[in-house]
């Protein structure tokens, strides 16, 4: 619900400006990990490490469907897929901070990869970058 709501209200530039200011205050001292569709391009464009997680539409819909099902929420896979597709369309085409990977982000396609393996890859990336 939070992700969907954020996508809906983020089309309003005034809302985005206010939320970006809050996020920047939270991360002002560094040493934070943040997740979001424009964290690396708008909120923290100078972040030391940026990861852009991606997955196919079908994979993301399946994951969301499983998450909803585990919580006991009634949903069917096709409606979840359509909702994900609409969210992508809305986020990619908004005029203010559209969804895109930062040019210096490491892109990880997590399609078919378990969450713990994706997390391990990110931890390895961070460890390598911090040692460099």
Task: Indicate residue ranges for each PLM-predicted region.
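ATP-dependent small-molecule kinase phosphotransfer cores
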Residues: 1-32, 58, 62, 66, ...
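Short secondary-structure boundary/capping segments
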Residues: 24, 41-43, 97-99
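Short glycine-rich anion-binding loops that position phosphate/pyrophosphate groups of nucleotides
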Residues: 38-40, 57-58, 113
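Short glycine-/acidic-enriched loop or helix-start segments at secondary-structure transitions
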Residues: 43-45, 62
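Phosphate-binding beta-loop-alpha motif at adenosine-nucleotide cofactor sites
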Residues: 48-49, 98-115
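H-loop (His-switch) and adjacent beta-strand-loop-beta switch element
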Residues: 53-54
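C-terminal alpha-helix
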Residues: 121-132
């Amino acid at each position: 619900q939070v992700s969907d709501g954020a996508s809906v209200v983020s089309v309003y530039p005034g809302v985005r400006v206010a939320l970006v200011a809050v996020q920047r205050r939270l991360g002002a001292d560094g040493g934070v990990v943040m997740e979001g569709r424009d964290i690396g391009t708008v909120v923290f464009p100078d972040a030391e490490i940026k990861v852009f997680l991606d997955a196919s539409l079908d994979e993301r819909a399946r994951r969301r469907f499983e998450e909803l099902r585990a919580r006991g929420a009634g949903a069917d896979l096709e409606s979840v897929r359509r909702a994900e597709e609409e969210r992508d369309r809305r986020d990619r085409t908004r005029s203010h901070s559209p969804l895109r990977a930062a040019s210096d982000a490491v892109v990880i396609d997590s399609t078919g990869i378990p969450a713990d393996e994706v997390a391990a890859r990110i931890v390895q990336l961070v460890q390598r970058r911090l040692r460099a």
